[in-house]
Amino acid sequence: MSTTAIPTLPIDLLTRPAGGVSMRLTQYGYPGDPDSDSETRKGHGAYHSLVAGESVALTDSGLRALGLTRSAVLSQHPWVDIKLRGGGVLERRIDDRAPEANRRVDLYEPGGFDRRLPDFADVTLRP
């Protein structure tokens, strides 16, 4: 009989999706954004102030898929890794809320729309 122990995982790793959650990747806040609103133009997110190169908005279904709630985002200031096809990773903080019903991560891009980004990415909560 073998006495080899079976490795165990901490509970926080068991409650997160392995490899990330596939989400629609969109952009907002860029010059000429047809869906822009006055709060975004002022740099105000639903949870925290918006910062170029750092802020993202997530839909409620995206938050749920990552095991988060709106109140957790307000109190914890969570960051996510956005894994792009081809190997790139964007590190962003959840500062805003996107209104759509689908799983979506919306990059705050006040410097302009980036046409090089794909339409989908895998999103994981940073430890």
Where are these regions (language model features)?
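Secreted/periplasmic proteins
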Residues: S2-P127
